[in-house]
Regions:
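Hydrophobic anchor at the start of a short beta-strand
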Residues: 12-13, 89, 146, 210, ...
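Short, ordered loop/turn segments at secondary-structure junctions
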Residues: 17-20, 56-57, 93-98, 103-104, ...
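Hydrophobic alpha-helical scaffolding
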Residues: 31, 67-71, 110-113, 121-129, ...
Length: 325
């Protein structure tokens, strides 16, 4: 890119992460940016050079090259925008912006002109692929306006920024889905304090991220059942960990299932409008889709359903919430 700009008679210089430097911690493969020293690049810019910075990489405080992991390039762009107090950070992708849902599944999905940081963060964390959660969280922390644009089409894209007025116009902003889900159920766990801490603490030691959790009374008196979801890619590790601690926990039965999908609706209007959960659950019921697990946040409702129904669920919910208008 730097060479191409030079051929257009534009002065440009390329920078590796260590040359900037972009300082990170030592977690190789998923390093976290700690600081960006701006003096070198700023001096180059003042001399008329366009700065081309490699994403996805940094250097630790003991001078080891690190990589930032998934979403590292977008995160680098946002971090640079924050460090230089830029008015906006533009992210060019293979799509024209952020859509109400996956347009490959719902043909009438609409491109959003605007979405808040919180909504985008929820959509990204629940399976939307446009941006990774790290870049959105960083933009939200430093109040960097983000714009998602297409590399192939000259269209306005989607602006991601702080909440604006008239946020009650739509009940929800978007629908996300995650196919990388596994459901685990532990049955007949002795009902006593500390059991959940023991189970999830053991999983955390092996970096297994637990998402949706449901605990209910067992048919056997004095026992409880616990169901939770994890990334399907972590299922084998989770099975080994749980079998290892079975003696300490005392559960009677372990079951796992992978043919499940998480569907999430997201919108700031949930803070002030009632009936959104009702609409979601009634829509799924009318289409004979059984809900296995439910989890909520202030602006999100997620349900776990059988994978054979996820496309039907997304299309039905998109229609029910008038997102195609």
């Amino acid at each position: 890119l730097s060479i191409a700009l030079e051929e257009l008679s534009l002065k440009a210089r390329s920078w590796m992460g260590w040359q900037v430097p972009i300082v990170s911690d030592n977690t190789h493969g998923k390093a976290v940016i700690k600081d960006i020293k701006t003096s070198n690049i700023m001096g180059s810019i003042k001399n008329g050079y366009i700065a081309i910075v490699s994403g996805f990489q940094g250097i630790s405080e003991d001078n080891r090259i690190t990589t930032l992991g998934r979403g590292g390039s977008d995160t680098t762009a946002v971090a640079l925008a924050a460090a230089f107090s830029a008015d906006r950070c533009d992210i060019y992708t293979d799509v024209e912006g952020v859509y109400t849902t996956d347009p490959r599944i719902v043909k009438k999905a609409k491109k959003l002109d605007f979405i808040t940081y919180e909504e985008m963060l929820e959509l990204a964390s629940q399976g939307a692929k446009v941006l990774q959660t790290r870049s959105v969280a960083l933009a939200m922390k430093y109040k960097v306006n983000l714009r998602v644009l297409s590399s192939f089409a000259n269209v306005p894209g989607t602006l991601i920024a702080e909440e604006r007025g008239n946020m009650e116009k739509s009940e929800i902003s978007g629908i996300a889905h995650s196919l990388n889900e596994a459901k685990i159920t532990l049955s007949d766990i002795p009902d006593q304090p500390g059991q959940a801490a023991n189970i999830f603490g053991a999983l955390a030691e092996f970096s297994v991220n637990v998402d949706m959790i449901v605990q209910s009374s067992s048919i056997n008196h004095g026992s409880t059942d616990m169901t939770f979801t994890i990334p399907e890619t972590d299922l084998l590790i989770a099975e080994k960990v749980i079998k290892k601690i079975k003696g300490n926990i005392g559960f009677k039965k372990f079951t796992s299932e992978t043919n499940v999908v998480k569907i999430s609706i997201v919108g700031n209007a949930m803070r002030s409008q009632s009936g959104i959960a009702k609409t979601m659950f009634q829509t799924l019921a009318k289409n004979h889709i059984n809900i296995q697990v439910i989890s909520t946040s202030e602006i999100k409702i997620s349900v776990l359903i059988s994978s054979e129904y996820y496309e039907l669920a997304m299309r039905s919910l998109h229609l029910a919430f008038n997102l195609d208008k």
